[in-house]
């Protein structure tokens, strides 16, 4: 279960969905995004010989392909310490620079929240 104090229930939901995608598919990362209508899109890392996408970029692509106009929030469950610049850029492209990106460990605990517009991995971290 995703247990992070002071986490909004809707944010807790996307962290839980991201964690489930990671575990269910046995991939390095799971991600989920929530669009402007509250719909969620969940994905895992794509690692094919001809196509490589992070879980977060895949979730953003799924949102775009489904007609989302904006994002309210994004979450990634990973062993990495921060969301990559490329991942934040994808979130920023659809949601804008103020869109929060929650970074959680494999246990589901949110380690940090960073703005999609943050210029560097650690510059705008909180949590």
Model-derived features: positions:
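N-terminal first-folded block
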Residues: 9-44, 48
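Residue-level detector of alpha-helical recognition elements and their boundaries
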Residues: 33, 52-53, 74, 106
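A short, polar/charged loop-to-alpha-helix boundary motif
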Residues: 49-62
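C-terminal binding/interaction regions
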Residues: 2-24, 66-127
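Short, glycine-rich nucleotide/cofactor-binding loops
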Residues: 45-52, 80
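Short glycine/serine/threonine-rich phosphate/pyrophosphate-binding segments
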Residues: 41, 56, 84
